[in-house]
A protein has these predicted regions:
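Fold-level recognition of mixed alpha/beta catalytic cores in primary-metabolism enzymes, strongest
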Residues: 1-40, 49
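Metal-dependent amide/peptide-bond hydrolase catalytic core
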Residues: 29-171
Length: 171
């Protein structure tokens, strides 16, 4: 299962009346451009053989229909299996958002939280013990393999402390 991190990205501009947009810096337009640019982290900065999901799930900005917004707040999540690249993504988001916002006369502020690492059964000895135990209990036909899942699981914390294996039971 993938690592999971969350972030809040705030874009700050300068409000103005809708009849005088040239007097402000539109945070909604800048934030929209940031969303598109962030996807280049997935498609151009990430090794295409490494699964990476960067999702922006909320977008809140503006106060009135006729006012150029001075602030947009967006919340998102990042999922990956690559522990090294995981810790590069925060800076890539910060740099991309700041560079795009600067072009619109706005500023970007990033709050990033590392939640849980990837759950990867990498200890071959423990995997073999679990596999052999499952075969003895349920038979070889019971065992299968799964594709990677971009869901996350805090079991990763236990895996950091003790030799472990993570498995699904049942159908």
């Amino acid at each position: 299962m993938a690592s999971a991190d969350i972030f809040t990205l705030t874009v700050r501009g300068e409000a103005s009346h809708g009849s005088a947009p040239h007097l402000g810096h539109d945070a909604i337009v800048a934030a929209s451009a940031v969303i598109m640019a962030l996807q280049t982290i997935v498609s151009r900065r990430n090794n295409p053989l490494n699964a990476l999901v960067l999702t922006l799930g909320t977008f809140e900005g503006g106060q009135r229909f006729n006012i150029i917004a001075d602030k947009v707040a967006m919340d998102g999540t990042v999922r990956t299996f690559d522990p090294k690249f995981r810790f590069e993504i925060e800076e890539l988001i910060r740099q991309t958002a700041s560079d795009v916002c600067r072009g619109y006369g706005c500023e970007a502020e990033l709050e990033y939280s590392y939640l849980t690492g990837a759950v990867i059964n990498s200890n071959a000895a423990v995997v073999n013990v679990a596999r052999n135990s499952a075969e003895k209990l349920y038979g070889k036909d019971f065992l299968g393999s799964m594709e990677k899942l971009t869901g996350s699981e805090d079991f990763a914390y236990l895996m950091e402390k003790a030799p472990s294996v993570y498995a699904f039971l049942g159908g």
